[in-house]
Amino acid sequence: FGWCLADYNTHREFGSGDRICYHGVMDLFRNPKLSAAVYASQKTPRAPSDIVLEVSSAMALGDLPGGVPGACWVFTNAESVRLYRGNDFVAEFAPDRRGRFAALPHPPIEINDFVGSLLEKYEGMDHASALQAAAILNELRRDAMEPSPLSRARMLSLRLGWNDVLRMYYKYIGVLGSPAAEYRFEAVWHGRAVRTVVREPVQSVRLECVVHNPILTDGPTWDCAAVSLRAIDQNGNLLPYC
């Protein structure tokens, strides 16, 4: 987590070389970074508009070391988060009230199952077998395709060969070069989805302009307005490299 509000100008002994300290949860111009969502999500919601939903990962395999998906966290003050792959429901996640972030009013939610109920629907597995197979695939996703002894034991129990596991991994999780999936995250509050984030390949780019103080007042000092510009995709997601 960041330890101060915003980045700031500093002396030459910082490693960035531009005399700016980048410790803030916002940048010099008060544009929020990802860590700002951690703090924003600690607010107790009183209306749907108070719900925060920020997904840590862009879900773009080519943007990750070795194309390995790694961890995905959601920063939210919702009661739970539903994950969809395309139009298929995958799983619903709730905050871990006993985990390492249990002291927070609204702990970040780790999205650690990207297979969920899909194996029952598309592979014809029974519920118990689907849970074990999904555990294998999610572990491979987390551990860069390195099966643990437990996963190998599960494969033997399910009579799954390595080629069977690879086929399902390519289909339900994916690797570099495979068709990219659309993921939809829904924040659930009082039993209904009140905010949505969609992650999919970028199809269009537009420039968003937000004026934070639209009325300037003529007075004894100069008034000014903060204007923020962001490059966003078709779903309103920030494009950080533009």
Residues covered by each model-derived region:
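Extended substrate-binding grooves/exosites of carbohydrate-active enzymes
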Residues: 1-166, 186, 191-192
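Low-complexity, acidic Ser/Thr/Pro/Gly-rich terminal tails and inter-domain linkers that flank the onset
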Residues: 51, 201-220
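Short, solvent-exposed loop/linker segments at the N-terminal edge
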Residues: 61-67, 215-225
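Beta-strand-rich structural segments
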Residues: 72-76, 223-240
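Short beta-strand/loop motifs in extracellular/secreted proteins, especially
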Residues: 79-82, 183, 227, 242
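Edge beta-strands of extracellular beta-sandwich domains
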Residues: 92, 191-205
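Beta-strand-rich interaction surfaces with strong enrichment in secreted/lumenal proteins
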Residues: 172-175, 196-198
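Extracellular Ig-like/FN3 beta-sandwich strand-entry sites
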Residues: 178-182, 222-224
